Structure formats: C-alpha cells, structure tokens
Amino acid sequence: MKNNKKVIAIVLVVSVVGGFLFKTFAPYFKSSKGVENNTTENGAILEPADFMTDSCYAFIQKQVAFGPRIPGNTNHAECGNWLIAKFKSYNCTVKEQVGSMPNWEGGNTSVRNIIASVHAGATKRIVLAAHWDSRPYGDKDPDPSKHKQPIDGANDGASGVGVLLELARISKDLPEDIGVDFILFDSEDGGKPEWAPDGENDAYSWCLGSQFWAKQKPQRTMRYAVLLDMVGAEGARFHKEGYSMQSAGTAVNRIWGNAAKLGYGEYFQNEETAGIVDDHLFMIQANVPSLDIVDMRPNFMGTQFEFGGSHHTHSDNMSIISKPTLKAVGHTLAYTVWNLK
C-alpha cells in the first residue's frame, strides 16, 4: 500500500488525458449514487458458500513463510509459483503478465502479475484484485536501524491475497453464469522510501504492476473491480475511499450495504474519505470502474485518516492478523459475488 504521506484531506480529481493521469485539487464531494437492489433476476437472494477463516489465515501464513516477497528475489519467485499452483488446483484458468517498469531509483523493477479466472466464458464478470509483493523497506519502523530491512507484509500484501485464494477455493459452488477474474498485482509496494528526497513523479513509483496491466489495454469485460489492501488487521476500518466513490460509487454503496446486512457494519464504515494512490487508480485509468477496500483509521486528533501503526514497519507480521476481520471481508465479498448484478 502506498505511503500515507499522499493521503490528504481533499480529493485528487483524476483526469485521463492521452493515457496519463493528471492530478488537480478540488473540494471533496459526496456521491449521489444509490444502492443497487441485491437480488438475482428472478428476485432470489443467493447465499454463498462458507468463507472459511482458518484456510484464509493459513494462506496468509504460507505467503509470509516464504519470507519477504521482493520482486527479483527467490522468495518472490517461489511464492509466485505456489500461488499459481493453488489457483490451478481450484480449476482456475491462469495466465501471467511479465515485464518491467521504471522504479524510483532510476532503474527498472520486474513485474509478474498473476491473473486467475473462474468461469472464463461467463459474460457477467467481476475483478477481485490484491498485490502479492511485500515492502522492501521498513521505513516507518520506530527503530531506524530497521528502515532498510524488508518487512513480512502479512497485512500489507498477504492478507488480500489470502482472501482471494479462499474465494477461489469456494468458487466451485459459484453459479456458472458469474465469472471472476482474480488479479494479483506485483511490484505495488516498492515505492520511494521515507528517507529518499521527494520528486515530482513519486506517485508513479508505486503500483508498478497495475500500471503495467493498464498499459496492456485490457478488454473491458467486467462489471467493476474490487481491490483489497490491508484487509486482515484486528480492528480494521474500511471507509468509502474518494476515487472509489467517483469511479464506482454504486458498487461501493452496494458492498457496504451488504456488509451492514451481514452484521459487519463495524468494519465497513458508512463514511467517505479522501482518495489515495493505490492499484485501483490505475485500473480506473484503464476505464475499469474500480473501488478500494483498504484499512484507514482516523489519527489521534481525528483530522485525517492513516494506515495504522504497523504500516511499513516490522510489526506487519502474523501477530496482527485477525480472523474476524478476514471473515467480515471475505463473507461480504462472497455474498456480493454470488449476487452479482
């Protein structure tokens, strides 16, 4: 997840001109888009297969056990191979996007996006995405001696992937007319560290995998895309992020409404926040309506939202992962997918 220095009190309005993102400041707004009716065409509400938190937790633990998943290292390669094998074991059609993108240091970072599809022939589709790399630096750790050491990324990285793997596992019971494309974006979290001087293109040092994906001009076959980022910590709070409301406000309201209906309103807060730079922003650039389910909490003064105390520190490990949080996210998404409009 992108550094929260870029989480600001007003929304950065995105214009897509000639394939580039131009950011301008504008007052924050409230979306007027309504909540969709959550029924199938014949009026029935479908109950999804059970989302099992034990297996979801185990998927997160397995990723962390590989060690830091830094693009180009052995841990990263082995974890990627394991992820592909798991999706294939759930009868997903899997393909990879491999390439490289410029990084903040002036060089290039490798990209290995993983795309796993369920019911590839279905025309009613949704994208569920997360990033699978982990941060090369613990640059916000309270111990300065650890700032240049890679972190586990249990929450920031592995948690979203764990939820997607569990959804893939239970997808054998998904109605055949509904298709899901699981996208694991690579090289999301290698952006400019805290100690490096600021530059005018810092925002582009993050989310390299989704930038690479957008450059491939993906065909628009999905209703919308849902990004999961930092969805496993105890006490997580998911607010209606600004770019998400601009791009896919109806879908945001529907998912948050589903969460409230299922008893997870404590996690899915009915409050809007400023926009942040995350993988969904580059999906939006590719003309895909997209939203971000991301843990952001008010700071101690209540003046702005932040990513929490473990963000980009060495405390982002398995000790902060909460099964009730995983259940809230996974059950809500399963219910939404099974009743996709």
Predicted regions and their residues:
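N-terminal Sec-pathway targeting helices
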Residues: 1-14
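A non-catalytic alpha/beta surface segment that caps or lines the substrate-entry region
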Residues: 58-121
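Acidic/histidine-rich catalytic neighborhood of metal-dependent amide-processing enzymes
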Residues: 148-250, 275
